[in-house]
Amino acid sequence: MRRYHETFRLWEYLLFTLVTLAVLCLCVCVGSVRIPLVDTLAYFAAKLTGDEPPAGLVSSILPIRLPRVLCVALTGAALSLAGAAMQGLLKNPLADGSTLGVSSGASLGAVIAIAFGVTLPGLPFAGTMSMAIVFAFLSLLVILGLSYKLDRSLSTNTIILIGVIFSMFVSSIMSIIITFAADKVQRITFWTMGSLSGSTYQNAAVLAGALAVCGAVILLHAQILNAFAVGEDNARQIGVDVKRAKLVLLVMVSVLIGVCVSVGGTIGFVGLVTPHMARMLVGPNHKRLLPASMFGGAVFLMLADLIARILLNPLELPIGVVTSFVGAIVFVVIFYQ
């Protein structure tokens, strides 16, 4: 049997970081307009040293491609981390961040903003983004409230059931809204398929902040997730406050999902497939699985976005279409093995 170390070692962090940076550079260089790697590295070197970057690259890298690739990497890392946490928490290999139904709630908020131009005054983000985040929080409150009403112990089965029912209910509401906003159907459809085109440095900052805070909390719960793997009763016996741990992890996952959906729409399979791929590489211990999932999710989504940009150039596919197609194939291969 293959043996794994209990925690991520320094050389593993360095290796995963180098691979992620290499893929990031590839995605920045390749696109509808290809930029030589030497020029790209010169641009990064100039930015790091505070020098003036080459004029020809400023218009293509700085305001357009680089923030998009950064947002893609951060979104992939967040979705994959959320998926790994949900699979460990719910002891369900088919769980991911959308299992809760929070992503459906965030999508509803964005659809309302797109269809009717509704905005929330006083918030620093654009209308679609702020509505998605707020509706993600409201969805979490509804789901946890109903789950607690039915089962005060917040059992896994109750949470999953309420999440599925809530998602179906929200989907019906979105269908009604689309019926009354026929002129916005194309924009709504493209958004719900997932797309990070037009991402800005502000979006990247929001994603980075959410990932830093929520990711740190989830990583600190790695040992608790290991305890959940052997059952909630066993976790209680070794001193884990099961209800509190569930609430904390569910809130952190919901925040990550809400922010990701608000920036890039609904992107499927990232939180489902990449944790399984990471588990094959580093084992089931969450102290290793969670960081590996983050790196794997970033790489997977960056490559998917690259395919979406260049496959039908000059047309661009929604990134959710690529992740669903590739993810479904990879998922079948993983389970076949």
What are these regions (language model features)?
Residues M1-Q337:
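Alpha-helical transmembrane segments in inner-membrane proteins
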